[in-house]
Amino acid sequence: MAKLDETLTMLKDLTDAKGIPGNEREVRQVMKSYIEPFADEVTTDRLGSLIAKKTGAENGPKIMIAGHLDEVGFMVTQITDKGFIRFQTVGGWWAQVMLAQRVTIVTKKGEITGVIGSKPPHILSPEARKKSVEIKDMFIDIGASSREEALEWGVLPGDMIVPHFEFTVMNNEKFLLAKAWDNRIGCAIAIDVLRNLQNTDHPNIVYGVGTVQEEVGLRGAKTAAHTIQPDIAFGVDVGIAGDTPGISEKEAQSKMGKGPQIIVYDASMVSHKGLRDAVVATAEEAGIPYQFDAIAGGGTDSGAIHLTANGVPALSITIATRYIHTHAAMLHRDDYENAVKLITEVIKKLDRKTVDEITYQ
């Protein structure tokens, strides 16, 4: 693997960290360690979201950049007499990407390696072999011989189970493969926007936020937004890349490496037109590539944030990503860097007058 520079080291640390919804502590600590040098203060709300505040002007408009800390994973629900683990998915999973995948169970005594198993195809009927194994029929094998042995190792119902995958820089070093891009890339964007603004004069109060429990209903975004009361918000997340075999442009038109995605519509929100226009104008002026997209079957933290208090103009800016909600997703470094650049340039242009124009035009 290529030698990791400062950015790649941060991305590796963020994606290697383990944190399903409700269990984001490790990820929060990693994000805090990277964002704290660029913030005036860092706090955590009572649900667990990290809020890093950087003040440009004391009475300036509040700009919220939210990426969620949590990743899709699993939770221990039962231990069988023979020491196998029954589990619950936490976040959205597709059964076809799960079998024979390595996982890590995080217990009070330490981490335990397991593998997702099911009945072997060799003993299935020809009809059964043609069907996907249902998640309810899967289990996790940790090499225990009994329930007592698993308990002795520290495994308990409610323990977090996380996909295991090593952060990898591909042969084309712009292509990055890792677990949990959804949504550690959003956390990284929030960190680097605050990094860019550390020596920049601007009349805004900027909040870089790592929200919790996005994958189970945008829950942390709701409490964080109530805490901040933002005037403008950006949800930063992964989006769908439509550049692999079998996907038509009608289904997904974005391509990796062609710029961040500006989401005009998703299942949780109709994007704010004034904010969309301001972002597009900034991208055009700065020569930053971008792509439009709409996601009928998913949403981001913007969906919760825009409904806060008396309403918040919000826009999702996402990174085209292959194979999301699996053990190994892939994205393009240029898209990440251009997303950071775009949001930074937008914030530099914002002030109270501009925010009011965006909001009420």
Curated annotation (Swiss-Prot):
The record's section on SUPFAM superfamilies has: Aminopeptidase/glucanase lid domain, Zn-dependent exopeptidases
Q: Which GO terms describe its biological process?
A: proteolysis
- Keyword Mitochondrion listed? The answer is no
Which cofactor(s) does the record list?
A: a divalent metal cation
Residues in the active site? 214 (proton acceptor)
Report the domain of life of the source organism: Bacteria
The enzyme class is hydrolase
Recorded hits in Pfam families, A to Z, give: Peptidase_M42
Residues annotated for a divalent metal cation 2 binding in this entry = 182, 215, 325
CDD domains, alphabetized: M42_Frv
Entry coiled-coil feature ranges: none
InterPro entries the record matches: Peptidase_M42 (IPR008007), Peptidase_M42_aminopept (IPR051464), Peptidase_M42_dom2 (IPR023367)
What protein name is recorded for this chain? Putative aminopeptidase YsdC
Q: Which organism is it from?
A: Bacillus subtilis (strain 168)
Gene it is expressed from = ysdC
